Amino acid sequence: MGKPRLPNQKKAYKELSKRLAGYMVRVRNIYDRLNEKAAMLVESVGYDGLKEFSFDDYPEIEREIKLLQSQLVEEMRTLIYSGTSSEWKNSNTFQDAVADKALKYYRAQIHGEKFKHYYRDNGDQLNAFLQRKENGLNLSSKLWNQSINYKESLETTISTAIEKGMSATALSKKLSRYLNDWPSLQADYQEKYGKATNIHDCEYRSLRLARNEISMAYRSAEQARWQQFDFILGYKIKLSDSHPRYDICDDLTGDYPKDFKFRGWHPNCLCYTVPIVMSEDEYWSDNRENSPNKITAPPKNFGEWVDKSENLERIGKANGKGTLPYWLRDNAKIKDCSVLMSKARTYGDAIQKQAETIARKYDGVVTPINYKGFSSMYRKLNSEKNMLVSDIKDSVRNTIIVEKENIKSVVKELQSLPTFDRYKSQTPEKFCGYSGNIINLKMPNGIQAEIQVNTPKMIYAKETEENARRILGDNVWEQIAKETGLQGGLGHKYYEEIRILDEKKDKTKIAELTKLSKSYYAHFR
């Protein structure tokens, strides 16, 4: 089945990069103009460079310095507002062409009333984007903070750059060079004053803020339009040809759901996106919304990246500081899963130790602590209607394995713990013949931990041979095999076969497998 050939996204992002470079030139021009004025003020007060420069020593130019700061705020705000509005429009113009191409391929009426929603430019979302606050700061507040940094940077730069008899013109050029080359300023300041400077790279911060705001406006407009395009199944996030070095961008390429909000993996991200579109048959299908080709979850490599301990540690720290990246802040389910996984790691060792202490009293063993992976957690959230991440009670889990006569005693000990929250009995009738005990513990950071309690025989029946041997040991596994004369792990096999069947279409097959599963588990109870 063919698909529409859409306008070239890669080329569009290359054009965006060129325009962004133009905006950066304008930011540097703003700083050059301000540096000229600052140099003239320094010349007017006769600063001789015998000690470090401070504007506080020259109250006669206090008003002019405040005007300089206000000028920085106003000119940067004008540039960013103008740039975001222009790129919102550019993005929409390109998406108009995408809609035209798609509708033409699908042989639909491009200007028909039915397809008007494809062409909404979402101006209300642009206004919301411009007025938004992040960590309590709107754009004006961020720029005013930068103007304070600029004033402090000027003091350090003037102290470093000044030479006896230097003209305002020469000083302004040196100020611009230093503010555009932060490492040189730091090195020269250290050499001149014998100490490190603790100020921030203000010009770079302004460049980054402008570039990110304008780039995010383009991406946000694009994604708003894609929500209106019901012919889009998802989209690919791809590396730019200009990608400078290996980083998170390499790890997270792939196909994403179209409701995954992407404004870049990091500041100045060069990745670009390409929509995945329907074939003509899919588009005119009565069940278009449920296309089997619809992307419903992030790619496998995304989950693997989140699962890594070092990344979860970074996510946990960023969440605590309120500095999560946009791709987490903007995607609630993904953020909630990632933060929960990070919190689960905090108490894994303590839960394992607690379970082992109880198991030893009854000559039992404990499975190694297991953390629920991102893909499994995200799939669970998406598959159950109205489920919240707080409903997930097994983000961290293990199993205590003891003989049947000790089960009640172990459960009682777990129920006596101060963190005990809930007990659940897994009955054969509800779980295809499998039976067990689940204890949930509520940890101080709010997560729910799960400790299961079961017998060696039930583990033999439920787990694959490889897993069961690892948990029980070869001697116990072989003893149960000899005693029962039954193959181990069929419970897991039946479960996996049932899990992938359709409840409505495969009722008969599900009933057959359920009967087999119940009969099998009955031998191990």
PLM features: residue spans?
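Conserved catalytic-core segments centered on acid/base and nucleophilic motifs
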Residues: Y272-P275, I315, I401
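N-terminal leader/targeting and assembly helices and adjacent pre-domain segments
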Residues: M1-D188, K192, S279-S338, S342-A355, ...
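Active-site-adjacent structural elements in folded domains
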Residues: L137-L143, Y193-G194, Y256-P257, K380-N386
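Short, hydrophobic/amphipathic alpha-helical patches that form generic packing surfaces
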Residues: K66-Y81, L209-S220, V453, E463, ...
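Long, positively charged binding patches that form subdomain-scale interaction surfaces
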Residues: W144-D247, I392-V410
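Long beta-strand-rich cores associated with HINT superfamily self-processing modules
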Residues: N382-R525
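Acidic, glycine-rich two-metal-ion catalytic cores of nucleic acid-processing enzymes
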Residues: Y193-E289, K412, T419, S425-N440, ...
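Charge-rich, low-complexity segments
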Residues: D330-D391, K507-R525
